[in-house]
Amino acid sequence: MNALNQAHCEACRADAPKVTDEELAELIREIPDWNIEVRDGHMELERVFLFKNFKHALAFTNAVGEIAEAEGHHPGLLTEWGKVTVTWWSHSIKGLHRNDFIMCARTDKVAETAEGRK
């Protein structure tokens, strides 16, 4: 079991530190299916989840929305027919915080039981 998917987010202020290169190398191993993307000069974590249809993709989007609301940390979500792209980063620090890795792991946990996964 991944310890990250059991962790909770901490409040992240604009002066919170971004993950260091060492932390990044360690944490990314915990979420091997996620990709690091650089957009607008900052790193983001992104993964595409495939589903059998739009209804299942939308249900997964809503489930991710529920954990985001519970933790007070919100992703970018793009819901399409049979596909959901989830992107985590910390807006307040314009980069990656430990919270983002926690939420990737928690998203993976939601995906394990999501109906209609391909």
From Swiss-Prot:
Keywords: Lyase, Tetrahydrobiopterin biosynthesis. The keyword Nucleotide-binding does not apply. Gene3D superfamilies: Transcriptional coactivator/pterin dehydratase. The keyword Lyase applies. It is an enzyme of class 4 (lyase). CDD domains: PCD_DCoH_subfamily_a (cd00913). InterPro entries: PCD_sf (IPR036428), Pterin-4-alpha-carb_dehyd (IPR050376), Pterin_deHydtase (IPR001533). Its EC number is 4.2.1.96. One of its GO terms (molecular function) is 4-alpha-hydroxytetrahydrobiopterin dehydratase activity. SUPFAM superfamilies: PCD-like. It catalyses: (4aS,6R)-4a-hydroxy-L-erythro-5,6,7,8-tetrahydrobiopterin = (6R)-L-erythro-6,7-dihydrobiopterin + H2O. GO terms for biological process: tetrahydrobiopterin biosynthetic process. PANTHER family: PTERIN-4-ALPHA-CARBINOLAMINE DEHYDRATASE-RELATED. Belongs to the pterin-4-alpha-carbinolamine dehydratase family. Involved in tetrahydrobiopterin biosynthesis. Seems to both prevent the formation of 7-pterins and accelerate the formation of quinonoid-BH2. May also have a positive regulatory role in the expression of phhA. This is Pterin-4-alpha-carbinolamine dehydratase.
